[in-house]
């Protein structure tokens, strides 16, 4: 069996990396950091492709020598925005954690044990914080099962019931200019979740790198809350309850959040992270590709194992020309909001699938609903916290797991996989466990996480 030379360990391969690095570098520079000057965009130099690496089976007598020279894969979790539809993502997380326990033989296994980076937007950001926040720097506070239950139990505190009556939120905004605010209820729910005694947990109180976006009205640009940045300086460390409130501060449902870092040096006026990036998968991938301090041996997307959780399209709506040609502004508001959100998430999915190219099926899994046969969802399914809507979403979440997985094809739209979402999650859990086990055999560490300084009381 061939082994990697030192140069191969450090340099990306030309097969997938030049395309993927360029795509993600441009996306990161232009959209995450607002760079418009092409001179500031980082484009990698073309390099020679290394020899292909043989697949190593766990039972192979030569497995250990081969495994110890492998770079390993960085495991990434991404969770979309989606309001109350986030219950679907929570159901997928709960199933994944159950599969991890089964395949690892560890009844205490948690999602955070097996992922190296997590990104979440809006409700996905809340779930990310829940899964990776810790009070003892050892164990996550919440289980995966508790994510969707938290949303089901606290939905009325986050999304006011009155905002979804009489025609929906956008109609009320257009007609009255306001829907009221659920800020107080949301703030209380977030504080209860992310405190340790009298101390508010911050971004530093997470077990692994997390990325949670919001949109900063003061700079009119996306702002990304990052554990890595928080560990560098207190000027980028924020209380987790405020981060969660900021990323889920949907205009019209709750007021904007005036964010201030723990040292008071950084401020932003934050609203819903879903406005900045409804699908944060690209943010997570670019973070890994550009973070050589914590991920020193990553060459490109073939060194990543990515799970992206979305909610899919539950409203099967199509529009005919004769129907829309006479629409006025108020008629376009809600369809445009839905098209923008769904289109953005799908565009990211297509971009990621394009970057992974041939290793798409082995390195990237996207889980989301493909419609529902359980009855028609209401037009405000994403903001309706009523028991009936929660019950419906719980059932759709279970249905989603049994549905055939939907894959994005490069320049080919989407296709229905032969495997169900449940089977995809089972396979992915197996890959996570295998990667976790192999790391103890490798010469060099796959990851080298920054560690927070000891807390001073």
Which residues does each predicted region cover?
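Conserved catalytic cores and adjacent C-terminal regulatory segments
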Residues: 2-457
